[in-house]
């Protein structure tokens, strides 16, 4: 089973059917003394500290892997609201912590563009999250040119 990850509170093109629990993964890593000395020299002259970049990437992947194991144990299809946090634990050691909400999710059904009669669907045939709202008579028009001669307030002063 592949657990999908999303930093959003939802999973695009999926419907969340159940929120299971908060899941997390963490790892604590320390810097290698030799690499730390080299990084100190590199810090003086400038440039990327590749030893730290690699350490952070390895830490991030380890924390994600640990979180996924916990999500799989819950039977989750995805983890949403994914967040990372780092903190200094001791001199030269840091923790990388990742967490999110394990969820059950199913793919959304694609809405047909046209009904079988080859006519556009009416506004009452279903609701799409991307459907433009239809202005009612009670709502003022937001178009640039109004159909009447009433003065209009323009907050931009134009």
Curated annotation (Swiss-Prot):
Record InterPro entries: UPF0145_dom_sf, UPF0145_YbjQ-like
Highest rank taxon of the organism: Bacteria
Bias-annotated ranges (Polar residues): 113-122
Transmembrane parts of this sequence: none
Region (Disordered): 113-158
Family from the record: Belongs to the UPF0145 family.
PANTHER family: UPF0145 PROTEIN SCO3412 (PTHR34068:SF2), UPF0145 PROTEIN YBJQ (PTHR34068)
HAMAP family, alphabetized: UPF0145
Protein name, per record: UPF0145 protein Psyc_1853
Annotated source species: Psychrobacter arcticus (strain DSM 17307 / VKM B-2377 / 273-4)
